[in-house]
Amino acid sequence: RQLEWLKSDLALVKDKEEKMIVFCAHIQFRHNADKDNPDKTKNMAAAMDCLTDLHEAHVMIGHTHYAQNFIHHDYITKGGTPVYEHIHGAACGAWWSCNLNLAGSPNGYSVYEVSGKTMKNWLAKGTGESPDLQMRVYDGNQIYGGAEGHPSGEYEYSWTEGGIGPKGAQAPGFSGLKGCFVASIWNSDEDNWKVELFQDGKKVGDFKQVPYEIGDVCAISFFYNDLGRKTATWSRSTPQYYWYIEAPGGDPTKVQNWEVRATQTIPGGGVVNEYKCSTLQTDYSGFRNVE
């Protein structure tokens, strides 16, 4: 019924190829094709096809309690850009327990700027935070918790190995992060962001995206070792947040005068945003228990 309503509603729109659609729903579209439920897969494809009749299409989603951008490369709008799915972190974050969403992004909201038939610009805005807070940069060698980690705690986590929390809650790691700067950029995507490392004002190289889902192990350690959480919900892993580059000398803590620059180019609108960070997140600074 909802699909038929969408089709009939859009049938009333004239000159659709000259208009943008903002489609709001609760459950995410990304990865929602279901081989065991062909009607669900068919309906999802039909809904996405409806959106491609417009000049530009943005899908606004909640539900997950973490932020993620997902580009539907199989569904291209009349303006030539793919349907763009914005999965928003919750204003309440991890259910009002702290000032973080499940994957470590700040509690907050997104701000969008519309110009005619195009989403001209957008950013993720942490509640009470500067708009410039768009990333954290970590030392890929750091261990959190366990016998040797800092901050201390019962459960040990690292970027390379992940970790296991209470009741066997497992957080994956990625061995390729050893010796690397690791940037968590919660509004990033694989197509429209470029992340670079500079030292003494000169470019060192480009970051690559971590090739599969991992979690922010600093945030996960905070959830289990500081907040005392007990279930697997708090070891959430997500794609697309995490970028890495080998540090000169293999030890990010010893690199001097470095800066990470993350550049976002808005699809369709062409606006360019640049964000910078030159400080390692080595503890739970900025993480707050709000219960």
How would you label these PLM feature ranges?
Residues 1-86:
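His/acidic metal-ligating clusters that form di-metal
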Residues 4-11, 74, 79-291:
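Metal-dependent phosphoesterase/phosphodiesterase active-site architecture
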